[in-house]
Amino acid sequence: MTKTASEILNNPFLNKGTAFTKEERQALGLTGTLPSKVQTIDEQATQAYAQFKSKPSRLEQRIFLMNLFNENRTLFFHLMDEHVVEFMPIVYDPVVADSIEQYNELFLDPQNAAFVSVDAPEDIEATLKNAADGRDIRLVVVTDAEGILGMGDWGVNGVDIAIGKLMVYTAAAGIDPSQVLPVSIDAGTNNQKLLDDPLYLGNRHKCVSGEQYYDVIDKFVAAEQQLFPDSLLHFEDFGRDNAQVILDKYKDQIATFNDDIQGTGMVVLAGILGALNISKESIKDQKILSFGAGTAGMGIANQILDELMQAGLTEEEAKQHFYAVDKQGLLFDDTEGLTPAQKAFTRKRSEFSNADELTNLEAVVKAVHPTVMIGTSTQPGTFTESIIKEMAAHTERPIIFPLSNPTKLAEAKAEDLIKWTDGRALVATGIPADDVEYKGVTYQIGQGNNALMYPGLGFGLIASTAKVLNAETLSAACHALGGIVDTSKPGAAVLPPVAKITEFSQKLAEVVAQSVIDQKLNKEPIADAKQAVADMKWVPEYRAISK
């Protein structure tokens, strides 16, 4: 190593702060540049956690953690490993939303991200190379921030989403933080608030679209694959008009994943499989109502559709299990303004004697009698008592997932769903929910959090050197997550808790890697999936550094 003392102390992948040993300080030219006491990482973590707890708000806590992240990746992840449940909502959803909104005011450090500008496509390769800085990149999370967390278009501010996502990957699954790269594709913004803000740090023009936009995406993917051929490319929070198009183009060519389309769908499918493990029913007997037919809602529907086809149904047979409801009501094949994703799940008016009346959720529930109802509408309180009781009157164990977040946008509260169904509902929410006490039973509420799925999934794909991610591997991951449910316990959650995320992420990674190997989709020869995962796992402990 030929770096200077200053370069080492300012490199978050190398810096240990006061944990550099006396021998390291001498060898690296650090003698006298740090206080004399040599601390252990546990002592540093105790000190850092006390500072974290002293912050007066969750945003202040996030700023503190991000500063620690900028200074010392190993200590940051060591601390997060000890407090993963407490830190998850702070480094990611929901507090990251506050950070995005105030990104211009709070900006201090690019955090090793790559900022690709639509106005300079000729610089894409150099941008990625500079940001990687010689590191062996195995995972790239890229966003154009057009569809942030139900917040909409936030331009270059959305890079915090990519950074936060990668934090969860490392904390949950053990992906080496020096092998990841967050990327912002700055295609402009249609957010007038940002365009009018003199502090805005991104391209100050409306979003580009069409051929110019897709040309930049193509150039980016080509450069990313050339520079990082062993990487997984994770697309995050793209607008719904572009997300599916991009995924469809590349999913059969490279190892890629769209968390909003596939990740949400996978977690919801895993939750449904967990619920069906409890109710002892078959997925082939379910009627599925999707309330909210945007990117997330249709991504969920597509994932369940694939599972029904894996279970032996034809595509047309599987589609008969779905009812998509949006602001227009039930979506029919003659509904105007449908997206390509929505068109795949429309119904025919001839199926209903009262088709013209199916313009709201309650009317559709009465007509269809769904057994599964999934909310991604961001319309608060729309799963009303009368709607839920109508649904519960026609199925013994209604599966109800109000997934919209944050809390103020949720379709219903878990405690209400348990009460309105007399404890029969199998519930998952989009945000953490407290246990519900009802008639002597403690009902644990699963959280439909994508973080339950994508870290283990991604790690398994990387460890197995997967060429692509296909339906069979997606299904294997969903069954693995849904199979963790304790079916013998009254009130059991349909999904495992975030508190155990490191345990089941490891299991998921092993299942995914095995699926890839079984299908001969691995680029490199791998004899043992478990060993491949174990060999790649990074642990947040200091390693010896020498000249």
UniProtKB/Swiss-Prot annotation:
Cofactor(s) of this protein? Mn(2+); NAD(+)
- In the UniProt record, does the keyword Lyase occur? yes
Catalytic residues identified in the record: 92, 165
One Pfam family name from the record? Malic_M
* UniProt-listed GO biological process terms: malate metabolic process; malolactic fermentation
Signal peptide span? none
Going by the UniProt record, its keywords in alphabetical order are: Lyase, Manganese, Metal-binding, NAD
- Protein name per the record: Malolactic enzyme
| Native source species | Lactiplantibacillus plantarum (strain ATCC BAA-793 / NCIMB 8826 / WCFS1)
Give the source lineage, highest ranks first: Bacteria, Bacillati, Bacillota, Bacilli, Lactobacillales
